[in-house]
Amino acid sequence: MDFIVEKAAELGASELWPLVCARGLVHAPGVERIARWRRLALAAAKQSQSSSAMNVRAPLGFDDLIRSVPRTTLAVICTQGAEPLSRVIRRAHPRAILIAIGPEGDFDNAERAKTSDAGFVVAGLGPNRLRSETAALGAVSIAQGLLHDAEGSGEDAESE
């Protein structure tokens, strides 16, 4: 997770919400670990000359995630074999994006149903099965690139 925090901050993600999933391989981190992630995000922001540090939130469960997504945010759940994330973003023209990346075992059926009921859009990152770290950083890269393209065209954009 340290690697994801550091690299997502360097790529310009504005927030990271650690998600506790049914198939997650790791228990929810403690206060010390979250403080470490926040320090890593701050250091990465300085290193990448970002104007602001990524906000690392305390871990939250799936139901809390769904309740926390602002209505104006494009909420996406990534899964293998779905429509490409880049296409989903281009079609939606979002100002902000929340991208849920599953654990190594992927999201379970109940989690998928909850996100579907909450209006999350399903998107993929290509045909290969990716580790969570790779998926998270690939998704941030895609989203940031497309949001910055939108900014260049006069639209206001922010990534979560």
Predicted regions located by residue number:
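Structured adenosyl-cofactor binding patch, chiefly the S-adenosyl-L-methionine
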Residues: N109-E160
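Glycine- and other small-residue-rich loops at beta-strand/loop junctions that grip anionic moieties
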Residues: M54, E104, N128, S132
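Short, well-ordered secondary-structure micro-motifs
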Residues: A28-G30, D64-V69, S86-R90, A110-R112, ...
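A short acidic, often aromatic-flanked loop/helix-cap motif at beta-alpha or helix-coil junctions
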Residues: L60-I66, E83-L85, L130
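Active-site/ligand-binding-proximal alpha/beta "capping" segment
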Residues: T72-K114, F120-L125
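RNA substrate-binding interface of SAM-dependent RNA methyltransferases
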Residues: M1-I77
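Short, glycine/serine-rich, charged loops/turns that create anion-binding
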Residues: R23-L25, A82, E104-G105, Q144
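Short, solvent-exposed amphipathic alpha-helical segments in soluble enzyme
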Residues: K7-L11, R33-I34, R90-R95, A113-A118, ...
